[in-house]
């Protein structure tokens, strides 16, 4: 939905978020990205969108640096996640759109990227940052707190003593946003206004909860490769 830019100062065990900006993606670019995700990915389309999104990100990073009267020397490195196209830790692969080399050339700043694939190569599920950050917070406040993060997909972090467990629990806003866009001409359910007018379909919920992923033991992660419109429509047919 947007390009999020956080400018933070990190010294030893101290993390201070100084500035944060959110730049909305225009509808045309979002549609192109979704087409690449869901349809056959021709190399030409992928290259064009890859370049377009990278140059757009570079532009917004430059805007934020200028906005807060910083210099490029103030930025030691840019952490870049890109936009996930395909996430299959079961196949030991995770691909994203966005070119870290081009981004580094445009900004003339060191760019650190490929967090997901590097984590998978190290035996993880390809989502290392949330768990590390939550573990950091627990050490600072000296309490064991469980974190549930509801983004496109939901992930949970549980810390106990020196052990931290983090994994995806299942879908969250992704399916809701998809439904709002297709059937209500809305980007998302603002303030839960649509949901508040309805009632829980217990039979549909029971059908969805039979999904094998929910019974799978951690470590595990998921994405739109499993939880997508076809998945929802399949369960609707079962209970109709």
Positions of PLM-derived features:
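Electropositive phosphate-/nucleotide-binding environments in soluble metabolic enzymes
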Residues: 23, 27, 43, 47, ...
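Structural signal for hydrophobic packing residues in well-ordered secondary-structure cores
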Residues: 37, 61, 65-68, 107, ...
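Conserved ATP-utilizing enzyme core subdomain
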Residues: 2-17, 22-23, 165-240
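Short beta-strand-loop/turn "lid" adjacent to the catalytic site in phosphate-handling enzymes
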Residues: 44-100
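Phosphate-binding/catalytic loop of phosphoryl-transfer enzymes
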Residues: 89-94, 105, 109-187
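Glycine-rich nucleotide/cofactor/substrate-binding loop typically near the N-terminus or early
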Residues: 6-60, 64, 68
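Short, glycine- and charge-enriched coil/turn segments that flank and shape catalytic ligand pockets
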Residues: 14, 39-44, 66-74, 88-91, ...
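Alpha-helical scaffold segments in soluble metabolic enzymes
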Residues: 56-59, 63, 102, 132-136, ...
């Amino acid at each position: 939905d947007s390009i999020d830019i956080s400018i933070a100062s990190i010294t030893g065990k101290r993390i201070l978020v100084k500035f944060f900006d959110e730049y909305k993606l225009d509808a045309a670019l979002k549609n192109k990205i979704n087409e690449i995700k869901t349809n056959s990915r021709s190399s030409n389309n992928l290259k064009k969108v890859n370049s377009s999104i990278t140059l757009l990100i570079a532009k917004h990073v430059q805007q934020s640096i200028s906005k807060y009267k910083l210099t490029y020397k103030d930025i030691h490195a840019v952490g870049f996640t890109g936009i996930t196209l395909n996430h299959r830790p079961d196949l030991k692969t995770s691909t994203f759109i966005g070119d870290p080399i081009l981004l580094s050339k445009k900004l003339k700043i060191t760019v650190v990227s490929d967090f997901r694939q590097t984590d998978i190569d190290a035996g993880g599920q390809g989502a290392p940052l949330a768990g590390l950050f939550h573990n950091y917070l627990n050490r600072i406040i000296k309490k064991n707190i469980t974190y549930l993060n509801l983004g496109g997909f939901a992930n949970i972090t549980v810390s106990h003593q020196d052990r931290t467990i983090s994994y995806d629990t299942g879908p969250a806003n992704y399916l809701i946003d998809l439904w709002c866009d297709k059937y209500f001409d809305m980007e998302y359910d603002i303030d839960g206004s649509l949901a508040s007018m309805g009632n829980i379909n217990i039979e549909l919920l029971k059908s969805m909860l039979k999904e094998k992923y929910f019974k799978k033991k951690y470590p595990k992660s998921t994405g739109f490769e499993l939880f997508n419109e076809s998945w929802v429509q399949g369960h609707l047919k079962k209970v109709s």
